Amino acid sequence: MKKIVNIILASALLVSSTTSCSDFLQKDPPSSPSQSIFWQKKSDFQSALAGSFSMVYEWPGVMSQIVACFDNLTDNSICQHDEDTYGKTKTIALGDLDPNTSGYVTYMYKHCYQGIARVHLLMENLEAYQGTDMSADEKSFMLAQAKALRGYFYSWLYQCYREVPLVTESLTMDNMYQAKASRADIYAQIMNDFDGAIAALPDKPYSDAQMSGYFSPGALKALKARLMLAEAYDDKGNADPSKMGDIVSLLESINGYSLAD
């Protein structure tokens, strides 16, 4: 009798494990969710935005930790070391570089386009999202931050390279080959992204709790002014008074800060 009971229990266990096997095997790894199960709730978009911002800190930190090493390419400092963690600025300063040179040359290009790709995924899925757990203001805020990030990444590409591809949507098999765009087009895209973000964000300083950890309108105006300043001189080094006036007006419009007398 005991043997029969054991056989019945074993059979029941086998049937149970067989019927539940498919469910068990279909479990998606929580650490790396696929596109098919992502973008389902507000926290997914918050994670995606954080992931987009994380490209700014991607090793070796060409847009963050080692950004000060750009001074090695000026008269402000001298580079004694030539590792990637110094941007390979010694090699760049000597002119001994090619498209495969590591440091700033390759990492800036790679990280900016990786960041732009992440931003496009976020923007496209956010615009299509119909979930009730996200208000219209929250969606507008995230889209504005995504535009600000795209403009920020392109601002580095604009400053470090001459002509680069202008990608404004996720790449597919149909549009993966992108020709280089003119510097004027890249500059216009940066200004458009910054202006769109500035208009959509609440006009609060970074010290405000809502803006902590994000682009504020003031920060974007400062970044915009920096690029405008580089374009305010003619080929002979003479400043354009009209362009300079626009820059001053832009800086004076920053909330919570003011120009020194």
Regions found by a protein language model. Name each.
Residues 21-72, 98, 241, 248-252, ...:
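Membrane-proximal, proline-rich intrinsically disordered regions
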Residues 36, 63-83, 167, 202-219, ...:
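Short, surface-exposed recognition loops and adjoining beta-strand edges that mediate ligand/DNA contacts
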Residues 28, 158-169, 240:
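Short, well-structured active-site flanking segments
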Residues 46, 50, 54-60, 83-161, ...:
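Conserved, well-structured interaction surfaces
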Residues 1-31:
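Bacterial Sec-dependent N-terminal signal peptides
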